């Protein structure tokens, strides 16, 4: 609808940052365009003189799909990474640190004449998950090399799985994940609670999973919730995911050396940087997290 398109365009309005003008609200706006599990946007922001702290909003946690909050803390890392690139457009260097005392991510901001906006900053408003079949175009070697590099951070590396055999192995894991999740009533209820079945609901909440990203038609919420009980099955979801994976250029797996909150934040930063680089290449991406969930 025009109303939905106007709302989406407003949220994703390209920034007008200027070097020498510090605009904390614009930094936060760009941070909120980051990835988050079920698009829950589980963050709060505290503005201070020379820093912005990104804090977890546990009222938006997903206890069934994310019982240890690892996705939530990865989401904080994604938001921090966006803020780093937005800060550069304002002539600010950004030093990101995890604060275990309050489980927050502190972004320290300093004037730096050497930093400038990059094409990753421009990609922030373009990046989004696209959960439909892709066109099958292969990535060329320079793109692959840059994507792998974009997904590397201290103690985090990216593995690119590109062959048909590797895709089939991933499909097997995803299929088993779908079976475990979609036969779990608590998982289904939690997932459905975050789906926005029509533009009006998406505009009203400003969060959640829009049916548009997976090519679903807009339906009244009461009707869609009744229909989804019939159509959201392990077999159907497995077929959709298999089609999407086979049509893709490949699957990226982000591997962290450690498994704690600080490491989850770093993994989120690595993923977001990767996704921004992909968006700068006009490459579409989506999560396929069932195997780790």
Positions of the model-derived regions?
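Acidic, surface-exposed loops and disordered segments
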Residues: 1-293
């Amino acid at each position: 609808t025009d109303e939905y398109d106007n709302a989406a365009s407003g949220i994703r309005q390209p920034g007008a940052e200027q070097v020498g003008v510090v605009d904390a609200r614009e930094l936060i706006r760009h941070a909120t365009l980051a990835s988050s599990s079920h698009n829950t946007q589980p963050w709060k922001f505290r503005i201070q003189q020379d820093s912005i702290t990104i804090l977890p909003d546990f009222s938006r946690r997903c206890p069934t799909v994310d019982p240890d909050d690892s996705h939530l803390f990865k989401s904080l890392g994604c938001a921090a990474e966006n803020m780093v690139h937005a800060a550069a457009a304002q002539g600010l260097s950004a030093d990101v640190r995890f604060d275990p005392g309050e489980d927050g991510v502190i972004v320290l901001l300093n004037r730096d004449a050497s930093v400038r906006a990059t094409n990753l900053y421009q990609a922030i408003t373009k990046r989004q998950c696209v959960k439909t079949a892709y066109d099958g175009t292969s990535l060329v070697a320079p793109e692959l090399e840059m994507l792998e590099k974009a997904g590397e951070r201290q103690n985090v590396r990216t593995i690119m799985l590109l062959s048909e055999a590797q895709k089939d192995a991933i499909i097997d894991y995803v299929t088993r994940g779908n079976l475990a999740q979609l036969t779990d009533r608590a998982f289904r209820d939690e997932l459905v609670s975050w789906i926005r079945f029509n533009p009006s609901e998406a505009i009203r909440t400003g969060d959640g999973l829009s049916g548009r990203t997976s090519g679903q038609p807009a339906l009244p919420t009461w009707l869609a919730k009744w229909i989804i009980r019939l159509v959201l099955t392990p077999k159907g979801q497995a077929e959709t995911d298999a089609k999407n994976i086979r049509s893709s250029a490949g699957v990226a797996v982000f591997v962290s050396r450690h498994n704690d909150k600080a490491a989850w934040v770093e993994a989120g930063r690595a993923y977001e940087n990767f996704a921004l680089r992909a968006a700068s290449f006009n490459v579409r991406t989506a999560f396929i997290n069932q195997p780790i969930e």
